[in-house]
């Protein structure tokens, strides 16, 4: 148990650091001052016009996916940024397979017209 003591202490401290800020506002919060204006949607000082839950076109989601693709690519490319003589063949081929999958996905989205604006 003594070899796990630092891990347990770290776990307790990290839980306290993350849970205390969540619990501190509750004793100071009051439910008596709820105004309907505070609960309404804000539209530049005007009364809300229309429903706030309108439908979005699926193209917005496709564009967001296009922006998400480079994030894992960069993240998984960092370990590959070592001198070429330090990478074994498995690491080299696995990175090539990863880049091939990303390239195929990007070509698929391009062919489907995800970046086209109509």
Curated annotation (Swiss-Prot):
Domain of life: Eukaryota
Subcellular location: Mitochondrion membrane
Membrane topology listed for this record: Multi-pass membrane protein
GO CC, alphabetical: mitochondrial membrane; NADH dehydrogenase complex
Catalyses which reaction(s): a ubiquinone + NADH + 5 H(+)(in) = a ubiquinol + NAD(+) + 4 H(+)(out)
Keywords tagged on the record: Electron transport, Membrane, Mitochondrion, NAD, Respiratory chain, Translocase, Transmembrane, Transmembrane helix, Transport, Ubiquinone
Pfam families: Oxidored_q4 (PF00507)
EC number: 7.1.1.2
Record carries keyword NAD: yes
Broad class of the protein's primary localization: mitochondrion
GO-annotated molecular function: NADH dehydrogenase (ubiquinone) activity
Transmembrane segments: 4-24, 87-107
Keyword Nucleus: no
Protein family: Belongs to the complex I subunit 3 family.
Task of the protein: Core subunit of the mitochondrial membrane respiratory chain NADH dehydrogenase (Complex I) that is believed to belong to the minimal assembly required for catalysis. Complex I functions in the transfer of electrons from NADH to the respiratory chain. The immediate electron acceptor for the enzyme is believed to be ubiquinone.
Protein name: NADH-ubiquinone oxidoreductase chain 3
Organism: Panax ginseng
């Amino acid at each position: 148990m003594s070899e796990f003591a630092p891990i347990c202490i770290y776990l307790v401290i990290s839980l306290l650091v993350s849970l205390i800020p969540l619990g501190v506002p509750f004793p100071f919060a009051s439910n008596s001052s709820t105004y309907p204006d505070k609960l309404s949607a804000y539209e530049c000082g005007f009364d809300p016009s229309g429903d706030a839950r309108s439908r979005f076109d699926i193209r917005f989601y496709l564009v967001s996916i296009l922006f998400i693709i480079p994030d894992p690519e960069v993240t998984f490319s960092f370990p590959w940024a070592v001198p070429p003589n330090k990478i074994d063949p498995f690491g080299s081929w696995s990175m090539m397979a990863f880049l091939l999958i990303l390239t195929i996905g990007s070509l698929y989205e391009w062919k489907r017209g995800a970046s086209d604006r109509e």
